[in-house]
Structures are given as structure tokens and as C-alpha cells.
Amino acid sequence: MASVGVLYVHMSGVSSEILKNLVLAGIRAAICDGRPYPSAIASMPSSFLPPAERSGAENDSSAADADKEEGSPAKKARPATVASAMQPHVVELNPLLDGCEINESLVEDVPDEYFAQFGIVVASHLSVEQAKRIAKATVSAGNKFILVDTFGLEGCALLDLGPEHQFRKEMGKDKLSDVMKIDPYLPFADMMDVPLSDMTARWDKRPPKVLTTYLSYLEYQAKTGKWPDEENASDYADKTKTWLAESKIVGEDYLGDDEKLKHIASLADAEVSPVCAVLGGVIGNECIKAISGKAEPANNVLMFDGVDGGCRTFLLKKK
């Protein structure tokens, strides 16, 4: 596992938890996040970057103390990007690993070849367009792609482990099955093209609400170029009702009335620390299963509901 590198694209509360778990397990991390620091992650829950450090209060306090001491060195310049801010903390977390590579370019400026060199790419807060591009580049090289986000008390992950991923199912103590492949397999781009009306299963007569909420965020971002928030909550509510009604499997009020939809819009960027920690632990375990080839992986959606504490899988497939 030590030879596998995991690339984190756009740090979030949940991806920082995944990073922490895997780095402590001895799996190298690289970060691709050229967003401005600290504004891009001002509200992100993270033990890596304490609020005082992100607000600049820590630096200001250090500078004031330094001014009192004659000949004291000047304070360090604040990192310009999220990647550069995270790097020293990741290195400190596990000094035995070979550093932490960073890429400070904006995601849209990073070539496909860069993503293809990592065993697993874990991404958050991406547009569907960029997620499809990165997933294709990663999986085409024989690697794995995971898109994961949390929103309020819920979280959702979409996993593309590739058509050739092999694993052995656990059959009992110290006993594994013959080599198996994921079946059915659906590429990430095709997952995004599955209509809402086809997102049903034996125990799900209608699309799961956690998944529907996440897809509504991605749908709104694809249409407007912006993530839902309090400022555009009314527009999100209108567009989401239309999107739901067009599915013809649920009504426009499936996720709630106008006020509920406006509240859902305000949660798109709201990351809750315990939710990030739990889902981050689950995804970290999925990464280890993917790397080792031991145990059956999730195929191809994971949903977490913080109200009941349940995390379950769901299969997106063509019908």
C-alpha cells in the first residue's frame, strides 16, 4: 500500500478526514487545490487548519509577540493556496512518508496526464464537467476515482473503481473467495447520465433522498456555474422543482416545499465535523479495500444520513 499515492482534489472536511486516516495508515498523499487560502475553506471543519490559523489571528498574535522582541524574525507569509497551507500539516502527520506533493494550479488548468499517475483520486466540490474529465483520465489509466461531499447532516460519495478492478470477497476467518470483478460496472460519466426515473431498486421504489439532494446540487451547478447557497436559494428552489417534476417519477415537492428547498440550498456548503469524520472513515476503508483487493467494495454510491447514523450503498445502473 505504501507505493500507492492518493490525490486529493479540492480539500473539504470529509476529504481531510480521508487524508488523515490514510496518511496515518502509511499511504502517501498529494493535494491539488489552487483555490485561494483561507477564503475557499473558511468554514471547513478540519483539525489540520485550526480556525485561528485560517482567520489570521494566530499569525497576528505571533507578529505582535515578535515585535516585542528586538531582532526577532519576521512572521512567515500566509500561504496563497489551500494546497500550500495543507502541505506542512500533512508532512507533520506522518514524517515517515515521502513528503506531500502539491499542485497549486486551478483544477481546470491541470492536464489529464497529471491525474492519471495516482492510484486513487478523491475529489470534492467539483462540477460535473470536471468530475467526468478527471474520472475518465484516472480510470483510463487503471486507477480509481471517488467524488464525495457532505451537506448538513448528510453525505454522498460516487465511486468508479474501473472495469478491471479485481477483489476477493471475505468468506470467513482467513478465507477469501476466488478473484472477482465488479458487476455490474458503470463508468462515472454514465452514472451522471442515469435519469432520476431509473434510480430505483428493490427496496427503493423512488430515488433515495440523500442521493437526490446531492444530484440536485450538481444539477444546479451545471446549469448556473454556481453552488447553491442562501443568496440563490430561491433560484435553486425553482430550478430543482422543475428538475424533479421532469423526472416523472416524483413530484416537484419530493424534497420539500419552497421553504425546505431554500434550507437545502443553504446546506450545500455546510460541513458538520462528525458527519465528515464518519463518512471519511467509511471512504478511507473503501480506499484500503480498493488498494488491497480484499473484501467486496461498494458499488457505486455510498449515502450517509446523520439523523439515523446509517451509511448504505446504492447501485446506479442502466435500465
Give the location of each predicted region.
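Adenine nucleotide-associated cytosolic modules
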Residues: M1-K319
